[in-house]
């Protein structure tokens, strides 16, 4: 049972990280905000979810320049996550609400995990750090679907989840795989960070347990992580093996090799 005093602290910490996003979205929509440029293309792809144009991949990536063929970010998870608000409320309101909901979920997750891993002081510190980020980037970035901006707060959630694993909380492994998959699929800039952070967190957890007599409970977290990974990557894998031409994963590897050869 959580006492009323602890509950008030938690409610306050959650409120201060949620309010900036809510205020930013509300103010923008009242002023008639709408997606333009790349954001307009991204919202159309979100609206395509569960239609005959359903996206199996992410958006076009500049890796296409190196490979000489159309290459996309690895997967459509972000489109899937914001599709419902876009379809229900339209391209302007729905897009802003969809991105805002993802960001709210990310910051709430970060704050609650910090409390679970290290207590109230950690929760308050995490909330303060998130608020600093939210206020420093500017209000419009808090509901911007352009990938480098849209993944900023989910990226924080991912790092908090890896910290939890490093602290021995293996039950967060499925969360790391799920959020990490979202990051990698949405923008290639995370393709090295996510595996490196995940492996490092697991290594730290194993090293920290060497002196303990109890065996770490790996079975259930690994099983959960495998299920999450299969679900998260089902669409890109389907595209890879059913594409009439070269699959996107192969194209990404080719583009990476060509970039390496040019740099060499």
Regions found by a protein language model. Give the residues of each.
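Transmembrane-helix motifs of polytopic, lipid-linked glycan transferases
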Residues: 97-119, 157
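Transmembrane-helix signature of polytopic, membrane-embedded enzymes
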Residues: 110-134
């Amino acid at each position: 049972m959580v006492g009323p005093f602890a509950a008030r602290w938690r409610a306050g910490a959650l409120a201060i990280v949620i309010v900036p996003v809510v205020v930013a979205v509300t103010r923008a929509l009242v002023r008639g905000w709408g997606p333009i440029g790349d954001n307009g293309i991204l919202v159309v792809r979100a609206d395509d979810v569960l239609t005959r144009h359903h996206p199996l991949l992410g958006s076009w990536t500049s890796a296409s320049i190196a490979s000489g063929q159309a290459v996309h970010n690895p997967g459509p998870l972000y489109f899937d996550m914001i599709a419902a608000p876009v379809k229900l409320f339209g391209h302007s309101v729905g897009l802003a609400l969809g991105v805002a909901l993802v960001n709210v979920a990310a910051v709430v997750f970060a704050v609650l995990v910090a409390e679970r891993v290290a207590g109230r002081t950690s929760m308050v510190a995490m909330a303060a750090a998130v608020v600093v980020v939210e206020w420093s980037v500017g209000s419009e970035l808090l509901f911007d679907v352009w990938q480098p901006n849209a993944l900023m707060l989910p990226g924080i959630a991912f790092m908090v989840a890896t910290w939890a694993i490093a602290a021995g909380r293996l039950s967060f492994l499925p969360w790391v795989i799920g959020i990490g998959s979202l990051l990698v699929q949405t923008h290639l800039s995370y393709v090295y960070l996510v595996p490196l952070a995940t492996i490092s967190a697991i290594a730290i957890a194993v090293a920290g347990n060497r002196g303990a007599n109890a065996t770490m409970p790996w079975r259930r977290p690994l099983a959960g992580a495998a299920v999450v990974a299969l679900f998260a990557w089902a669409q890109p894998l389907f595209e890879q093996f059913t594409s009439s031409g070269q699959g996107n994963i192969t194209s990404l590897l080719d583009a990476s090799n060509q970039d390496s050869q040019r740099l060499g």
